[in-house]
């Protein structure tokens, strides 16, 4: 369901005046802009922190661009959002090879993400950060093939989350891509297509058949 289109809150003169605090503009943009729009303009996160790094001209341009592009909250699907956020995060990479794997147009992401518990929406992992996760992996028929969540209280005490460097190929691609869109504390359900999971070969040791979609519940508990 599409969100109601917001109205312009200020004129150009009001936007540029000293009387209007930057925080008010940032709050308006965060309230009404889509996640990918905010990511592109580096407006995600705590308002105070954004206000420190964003100058007034940048905010005025973002405000005008929001209404020109009509990329309001609720206008994009989750897969579109994650693709946009992924592209923004990749923009920090070296641009020397325009035909590298990252810049090829591969179409929409090969996974869907449903948020089960919201994170802090401030701390997002970057490529190369170490992330710590609890997870359960299931096949489409509900069979659990892997988990690090212990049910017995004795084992729970000694249980540790899975820790790895994100975005560098240590895990299946669906995980690498999805975790870059999650904030600390977030729990999400990921449905990952075979192309971004174990593909045509499957994973016989884990009893994952070839060409199998995998479902994970992943909780991002910490980022280093």
UniProtKB/Swiss-Prot annotation:
Compartment list: Nucleus
Pfam families in alphabetical order: BTHB (PF18410), FKBP_C (PF00254)
Keyword Acetylation set for record: yes
Post-translational modification N-acetylalanine, affected residues: 2
Coiled coil regions in record: none
An example Gene Ontology molecular-function term: peptidyl-prolyl cis-trans isomerase activity
Stored PROSITE patterns: FKBP_PPIASE (PS50059)
InterPro entries (alphabetical): FKBP3, FKBP3_BTHB, PPIase_dom_sf, PPIase_FKBP_dom
Enzyme class label: isomerase
Domain of life per record: Eukaryota
Matching SUPFAM superfamilies: FKBP-like
Activity modulation: Inhibited preferentially by rapamycin over FK506.
Alphabetical keyword list: Acetylation, Isomerase, Nucleus, Phosphoprotein, Rotamase
Record's compositionally biased regions (Basic and acidic residues): 89-102
Keyword Isomerase: yes
Reaction equation(s) it catalyzes: [protein]-peptidylproline (omega=180) = [protein]-peptidylproline (omega=0)
Region (Disordered): 88-118
PANTHER family reported for this sequence: PEPTIDYL-PROLYL CIS-TRANS ISOMERASE FKBP3
UniProt-recorded name of the protein: Peptidyl-prolyl cis-trans isomerase FKBP3
């Amino acid at each position: 369901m599409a969100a109601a289109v917001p109205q312009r809150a200020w004129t150009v003169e009001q936007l540029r005046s000293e009387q209007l605090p930057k925080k008010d503009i940032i709050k308006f943009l965060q309230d009404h802009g889509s996640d990918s729009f905010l990511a592109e303009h580096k407006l995600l996160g705590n308002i105070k922190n954004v206000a420190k790094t964003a100058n007034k001209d940048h905010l005025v341009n973002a405000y005008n661009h929001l209404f020109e592009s009509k990329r309001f909250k609720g206008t994009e699907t989750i897969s579109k959002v994650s693709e946009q956020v992924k592209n923004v995060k990749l923009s920090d990479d070296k641009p020397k090879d325009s035909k590298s794997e990252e810049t090829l147009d591969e179409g929409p992401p090969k996974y869907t993400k449903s948020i089960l518990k919201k994170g802090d929406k401030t701390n997002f992992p970057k490529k190369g950060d170490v992330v710590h996760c609890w997870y359960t992996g299931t096949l489409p028929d509900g069979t659990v093939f892997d988990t690090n969540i212990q049910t017995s209280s004795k084992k729970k005490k000694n249980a540790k989350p899975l820790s790895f460097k994100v975005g560098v190929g240590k895990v299946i691609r669906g995980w690498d891509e999805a975790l870059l869109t999650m904030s600390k504390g977030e729990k999400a359900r990921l449905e990952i297509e075979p192309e971004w999971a174990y593909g045509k070969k499957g994973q016989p040791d884990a009893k994952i058949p070839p060409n199998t979609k995998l479902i994970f519940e992943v909780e991002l508990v910490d980022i280093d």
